Regions:
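Divalent metal-dependent phosphate-bond-processing catalytic cores, especially two-metal-ion Mg2+/Mn2+ enzymes
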Residues: 2-26, 39-67, 78, 102, ...
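An amphipathic alpha-helix signature
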Residues: 24, 28-32, 55, 94-101, ...
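A generic structural signal for nonpolar/aromatic side chains embedded in well-ordered alpha-helices
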Residues: 31-34, 122, 139
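His-Asp-centered metal-binding catalytic motifs of divalent-metal-dependent phosphohydrolases/nucleases
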Residues: 68-87, 92, 96, 117-126
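Short acidic, glycine/proline-enriched loop segments that cap or flank alpha-helices
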Residues: 87, 109-110
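All-alpha amphipathic helical-bundle segments outside canonical DNA-binding/catalytic cores
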Residues: 112-116
């Protein structure tokens, strides 16, 4: 008879192999190396907060929407890595998708379809006013929610207001949180 932990591991990982179960940690280790090598400590701090904050928020939203939370966790970690690594935000979504593909291929972490899914979400995450695939929307929503939750007293960016209101409504939080418009 299986114990509770074994049952939960099978449930959480949907029967994936041990190697697949460690994909998140393998990617986290790779990203940590990039961030640790950043000379600007303030940018490094922002990188850790934002990338891992979005990653956790992606996992939460994916679980709620019955999407792959493991891939969602990975896309959150990767989505703005190019901006922090290159210290350049120009066309960061497109450059970020290219970097994500290179990293995923180098580490052999994902199938071709999974890599395409992750790269699509990264490529489209700056287009907050446009609706893309359900998985793309997880990243956009997590990005907006992390910006807000970092400090709810900060003004909400104009292009994120509608999406934030929809998220707070989806998670039945709009009556508890006031946000700066």
């Amino acid at each position: 008879m299986e114990n509770y932990i074994e049952k939960m591991q099978k449930h959480i990982h949907n029967g994936r192999s041990e190697e697949m179960e460690n994909r998140i940690e393998r990617l986290r280790k790779y990203i940590d190396e990039i961030l640790l090598n950043m000379k600007d400590t303030q940018e490094r701090r922002c990188g850790y907060i934002h990338l891992y904050g979005v990653s956790q928020t992606c996992a939460f939203i994916a679980l709620k929407r019955n999407l792959d939370f493991e891939l969602a966790t990975m896309v959150g970690m990767l989505h703005d890595l190019h901006s922090y690594k290159a210290i350049n935000t120009e066309n960061h979504a497109e450059h970020g998708a290219v970097l994500a593909r290179q990293i995923l291929d180098e580490l052999s972490l994902t199938t071709e379809n999974e890599t395409d899914l992750i790269c699509s979400a990264i490529r489209n995450h700056s287009s907050k006013a446009t609706t893309h695939s359900a998985f793309d929307e997880v990243l956009k929503d997590a990005d907006v929610l992390q910006h807000y939750l970092y400090n709810p007293l900060f003004p909400v960016m104009e292009h994120e207001k509608c999406r934030l209101q929809n998220l707070l409504t989806e998670f039945v939080l709009s009556k508890y949180y006031k946000y700066n418009m």
